[in-house]
A protein has these predicted regions:
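P-loop NTP-binding core
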Residues: 1-274
């Protein structure tokens, strides 16, 4: 699609629910009629297994092959190897082979923009590309940030996340300065929120105090729930596994919020083009 938006789901801290957010935001956008490609950019392959491809080591084509193809200037079909999930999202899968790509990228020409080069060949088929980043800053994560139009940051509602957020802001700032000047932060998603405590409110207050003047805190927040943890092993989204749950309703609202933000930006771009 001409106005395809690429979003990196990113946080350098682990355990913040990046993969779950990628799955459920992606399916939520698909439920709104959007064409969505999910990209697994983590050698652990959690996004791939969460969507039902548990034996990801047996996959014949993964993101590693696509990145290698760009480096080798291979002209095979860019759509080959993209998997289609029953909930109307596509997946570029990953497995442990992606770990070796870190070393290959170090010596590659234009090493930070290999993923961007690949996605440029397929993104016109989609409204959204969502990249599930690994919880560390390596060459693959830099490629994800270089390829992205924007970043969504899931933050677990825990005591004072400001230190980790500051490190992430510095990383994004460097990527913007040296690699991708148009990269922006769409917002912070409060995730795994335990509504039985005041911790979520304290976390939100701390985030607003430290970052609220420059970064949006999404109105939607995702509650902690056993069902949300269970669904990761079921190969489907929360919408399919427990459609009437509070978590499904929360992700539905979040997807609508992200989609509405996208429409606002499209209108601004249209106005600027006149």
């Amino acid at each position: 699609m001409p106005n395809c938006k690429t979003i990196a789901i990113c946080n350098q801290k682990g355990g913040t629910g990046k993969t779950t957010t990628t799955v459920n935001l992606g399916v939520g956008l698909a439920r709104l009629g959007k064409k969505v490609l999910l990209v697994d950019a983590d050698p652990q392959g959690d996004l791939t297994t969460c969507l039902g491809w548990r034996d990801n080591d047996s996959l014949t084509t993964t993101i590693t092959d696509k990145l290698s193809g760009v480096i080798r200037e291979d002209h095979t079909d860019p759509q080959s190897g993209i998997l289609h999930h029953e909930e109307n999202v596509d997946l570029l899968p990953a497995n442990i082979e992606l770990s070796a790509m870190e070393m290959m990228l170090v010596t590659a020409m234009s090493r930070e923009t290999i993923l961007r080069s690949y996605l440029s060949k397929v993104k016109d088929n989609y409204d959204y590309v969502l990249i599930d980043c690994m919880p560390s800053l390596g060459m693959v994560t830099l490629n994800a940030l270089a390829a992205a139009d924007s970043v969504i940051i899931p933050v677990q509602a825990q005591y004072l996340p400001a230190k980790g957020m500051t490190q992430l802001m510095q990383t994004i700032g460097k990527v913007r300065q040296y690699i991708n000047p148009s990269l922006r932060i769409d917002g912070i998603l409060l995730n795994i929120v335990d509504n039985r405590t005041n911790l979520a409110k304290s976390t939100a207050d701390a985030l607003r105090k430290n970052f609220g003047s420059v970064i949006k805190i999404y109105r939607s927040s995702i509650p902690m729930a056993v069902k949300a943890a269970e669904v990761a092993s079921k190969g489907v989204s929360i919408y399919k596994y427990e459609p009437s749950s509070p978590v499904a309703r929360a992700y539905d609202e979040f997807a609508k919020e992200v989609s509405a933000d996208g429409r606002k930006k499209e209108r601004l771009h249209s106005a600027d083009a006149r």
